[in-house]
A protein has these predicted regions:
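Core segments of cupin and vicinal oxygen chelate
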Residues: 2-49
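N-terminal beta-strand motif that seeds the catalytic metal site of vicinal oxygen chelate
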Residues: 1-11, 64-67, 119-126
Length: 126
């Protein structure tokens, strides 16, 4: 669950940039899906249903958190990066080969400052 300032705006970003779909909607809470798979919850920062989340309010939101979304294959990865770019996503690290992880990846930042990495599947070294 990510704490966000504006649930609708954040939900819209994940839908436009990554192709996720809304499964709940609302001003305080959202559930996002990839097809039938539940992948992410958004919760308004100042809503109080989960008071324990407020303990993180002292630090910068997004600090120490990164989300990873793996595409089905390399063409799907490239299409996902272009989709995110077309949706106005901030691409802070262009697509590149990560030799340690053996995949291609790109780094985005969502409207609340969370790091979002999209990557291709693991490619067996030859």
């Amino acid at each position: 669950m990510l704490q966000v300032a504006d649930v609708a705006a954040s939900s819209g970003w994940y839908q436009r940039a990554l192709g996720l779909r809304s499964g709940h909607g609302g001003d305080e809470f959202e559930m996002l899906f990839d097809g039938d798979a539940f992948v992410l919850q958004l919760h308004r920062l100042d809503a109080h249903e989960h008071g324990i989340l407020q303990s993180g309010a002292e630090g910068a939101r997004g600090s120490g958190v990164s989300l990873w979304f793996e595409a089905d294959d390399r063409p799907a990865f490239e299409a996902l990066v272009e989709r995110a770019r077309g949706a106005g996503a901030s691409v802070v690290e262009e697509p590149h080969w990560n030799p340690l992880a053996h995949h291609h990846e790109a780094t985005l930042v969502d409207p609340d400052g969370y790091v979002v990495v999209v990557n291709s599947p693991f490619e067996m070294p030859t």
